[in-house]
A protein has these predicted regions:
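Extended, domain-scale alpha-helical bundle/helix-rich regions
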Residues: 2-86
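A general structural signal for short secondary-structure junctions and capping/turn motifs
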Residues: 8-11, 50-56, 63-66, 83, ...
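Proteolytic maturation boundary segments
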Residues: 60-110, 159, 178, 182-184
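Flexible, glycine/threonine-enriched loop-and-boundary segments that flank and lead into catalytic domains
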Residues: 98-122, 126-128
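C-terminal, non-catalytic macromolecule-binding modules
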Residues: 127-130, 134-198
Length: 209
């Protein structure tokens, strides 16, 4: 619910609500404000102080075929690029990682800058990789993506100066944490719910359970 208590439960900070109130101001007339403005206030506040993590909502396994077996290296990653005092953290990188299913397309359209067969992308804080092959199950669903990595691109930068346009989030297949993620979207189908007639909705009088 759009109450102060409800906003707090959804992670809104006091500063973001205050900034939102200052931005829209006070008026004597009824007004409709796009909820995206409130979300942007939260985004701007968290961007300054929230520690960063990487996660994949729909994980698909990537096997880096030319990476040494049974080797794990720990890469540096900034906790918050907007705040140097936040320090750094270590990310475990190995032969098997997970990326998000939506970051790969076998037959991509133009201007798709994420991973696809033969295309090179950057793994954030890690290396450049190129897709070589995909493995599918009996239903035709992709279960594994096989890639090559360039060991001279550690940290996400190449020695020869070549650039890639896609940068992917990833997590280690050896050291990851399962999480429950609740994705909230719009609760109403209309920008102004008060203008919608709900007379077609009826309350049932007999219910069998």
């Amino acid at each position: 619910m759009p109450t102060i208590s409800g906003l707090r439960r959804r992670g809104y900070t006091p500063e973001s609500i205050k900034n939102f109130s200052d931005e829209i101001g006070v008026t004597k007339r009824d007004a409709i404000v796009d909820v995206a403005k409130l979300e942007n206030s939260l985004r701007e506040d968290l961007n300054k102080k929230a520690p960063r993590v990487m996660g994949v909502l729909e994980p698909i396994k990537v096997i880096i075929t030319n990476y040494p077996d049974n080797e794990i290296e720990y890469l540096d990653a900034k906790n918050n690029p907007e705040d140097e005092s936040a320090g750094k953290r270590k990310l475990a990188f190995s032969k098997q990682i997970f990326i998000d299913k939506n970051d790969f397309m076998e037959d991509p359209p133009k201007k798709f800058f994420r991973l696809s067969p033969g295309k090179e992308v950057r793994l954030k804080f890690a290396y450049y990789i190129v897709c070589e092959n995909v493995i599918k199950n009996d239903s035709g669903e992709i279960t594994e993506i096989h890639c090559n990595y360039d060991p001279n691109t550690k940290g996400g930068m190449s020695e020869d100066g070549r650039k890639v346009r896609g940068t992917l989030h990833w997590v280690s297949a050896q050291e990851f944490i399962e999480a429950e993620v609740r994705l909230y979207d719009r609760l109403f189908i209309s920008d102004n719910p008060e203008t919608v007639s709900y007379t077609h909705l009826t309350l049932p009088t007999r219910i069998f359970v």
